[in-house]
């Protein structure tokens, strides 16, 4: 299974780094392919390095603008025109989407996949799993629930999103519900 992971390009607190490493090891040990944003630094570099060291297949998708910062040990690196095309390629290649902590770029990727789900542009069986390390996405979860309760977010979008407190819980969900 191709598991697309959205996460930060920046170095972050150790608790987030540990969860990224755990997720990457589980992806590799499960025989899955990691598909990620292609960057060689921050959490992106951590997940790629960890999956690679654990014997997993690593596929990067990176925009032309930052291709010089691409992860060098990827089994495959796809260079695309811009971040819009990068998001589409990441989403298209992933059988499931996993979201780790991140900033505006990660949030953009996440809301893009939710928009695609809302508009019927996403495979109906594609799951979105958000790893809620230390409650990082708790307010986002509450916002989605409020949007759903107020009629701004369709039930099928809510049903496609699963929040997991740990990478282990995320992978259990994926293994049980994945494509």
Model-predicted regions and their roles:
Residues 42-46, 136-148:
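Glycine-rich, charge-decorated loop segments at or immediately adjacent to ligand/cofactor-binding or catalytic sites
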Residues 62, 100, 116-141, 155-157:
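Short, acidic/small-residue loops that bind anionic groups at enzyme active sites
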